Amino acid sequence: MRLTPAEIAAIKAAARQAFGETAVVRLFGSRVDDSRRGGDIDLHVEVDPPIDEWRARTQFEAALFSRIDPRKVDVVVTERGMQPRAFERIAYRDGIVL
């Protein structure tokens, strides 16, 4: 996994702040593979419904970028209990829980 301990801590803290204490954050995509280089940070966040996704995403990014250097971060949000879409199934299958 190509994230530093400080980045992991920042992601988890920002997710708790924006999405709540029960949010589960997974890293997926190229950053999971230590042999690859570059790439954005792909995060899957599983949350308890209901959620104001727009507000929570904005709050998450603000909290995250106050803790780490801004960079390309893609966030996929899934409400717990909902049928995952194809892209979300990849995150569940290949992702690493932070």
Each language-model region and where it sits:
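Catalytic core of pol beta-like nucleotidyltransferases
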Residues: 1-26, 32-38, 48-98
